[in-house]
């Protein structure tokens, strides 16, 4: 389970560096403690850190409101301690949330949430306090559903990602 943290992230850094690109990283709080070298290198590159739970084993559904509030605040604090920056964004582990998640994130000062796949444009969410923007998430090119649910292989996934990029790039020119 640690391939991404041992090998993949460094290859991605090289590619992003080659093209002078910054990244927004979905960051599990435990990565700050377990892989501080990733955090150090990301900070050198000016990356933005987005909350992504403690790890991908603890999902939000099934948590009562107080437990979820505590988990969100603990994750945000761990990432702030590890990176020096409080996350402005959130993507739930396995893109999971509860009915309370948007309100709890806004309450904690999070500015945007990436859990919803219902639009391809950002939109303001109705929350009890503060504000929260829903940022589009392209589950269509997420490796987990592509591989597990649709049986896509590496070449097919790569082509889907390139196709999506080409469409978005063309739309951006309009």
PLM regions: where:
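Glycine-rich, positively charged active-site loop/lid region within alpha/beta enzyme cores that binds
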Residues: 133-151
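Catalytic alpha-helical scaffold of carbohydrate-active enzymes acting on polysaccharides/glycoconjugates
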Residues: 1-134, 158-174
